[in-house]
């Protein structure tokens, strides 16, 4: 089995948040997600995320807006893009209403989402919109007119 074949079997997501409890909450929210299969890995810091991205391929990154000590997406996303990551990056935050969130495309962010908005349907939508993935036949009905 080639790496590309394995990659197609599961969408690989890197969740970057300085609070492990947020990762556990995400895993619990998406536990019932069966299609597509999703493999979620965790990084507690931007440094750890950079190491993982250099070592393996991820289809999607969900990045907490604020990582300690005080870096927000305007600092962390350029670091991810700077090492060559070209896949989709979504900024996740408890509050996405701040004015600076309107600037997210300028920093290489593809989308933003509130932590309270993430569930099975939201993740399926994100994968449909941003990740190259072979859509299952039963999803294709959603796109027919």
Describe the role of every protein-language-model region.
Residues 54-56, 79-86, 107:
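Conserved phosphotransfer cores of two-component systems
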Residues 29-33, 52, 103:
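Alpha-helical interaction/dimerization surfaces of two-component signaling modules
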Residues 74-75, 93-113, 121, 125:
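Alpha4 helix (beta4-alpha4-beta5 surface) of REC/receiver domains from two-component response regulators
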Residues 61, 89, 112-113:
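Two-component signal transduction core modules
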Residues 27, 42-60, 68:
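Acidic, metal-coordinating helix/loop segments flanking the phosphotransfer/catalytic sites
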Residues 120-128, 132-145:
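CheY-like receiver
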Residues 61-80:
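Conserved phosphotransfer microenvironments
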Residues 9-30:
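Conserved acidic segment of CheY-like receiver
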């Amino acid at each position: 089995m080639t790496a590309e074949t394995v990659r197609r079997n599961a969408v690989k997501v890197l969740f970057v948040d300085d609070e492990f409890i947020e990762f556990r909450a995400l895993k619990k929210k998406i536990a019932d997600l069966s299609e597509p299969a999703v493999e979620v890995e965790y990084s507690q810091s931007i440094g750890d995320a950079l190491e993982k991205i250099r070592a393996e391929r991820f289809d999607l990154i969900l990045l907490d807006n604020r990582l300690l000590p005080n870096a927000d997406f305007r600092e962390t996303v350029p670091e991810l893009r700077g090492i060559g990551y070209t896949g989709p990056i979504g900024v996740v935050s408890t509050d996405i209403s701040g004015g600076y969130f309107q600037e997210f495309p300028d920093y290489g962010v593809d989308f933003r989402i509130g932590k309270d908005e993430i569930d099975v349907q939201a993740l399926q939508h994100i994968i449909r919109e941003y990740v190259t993935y072979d859509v299952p036949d039963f999803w294709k009905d959603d796109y027919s007119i």
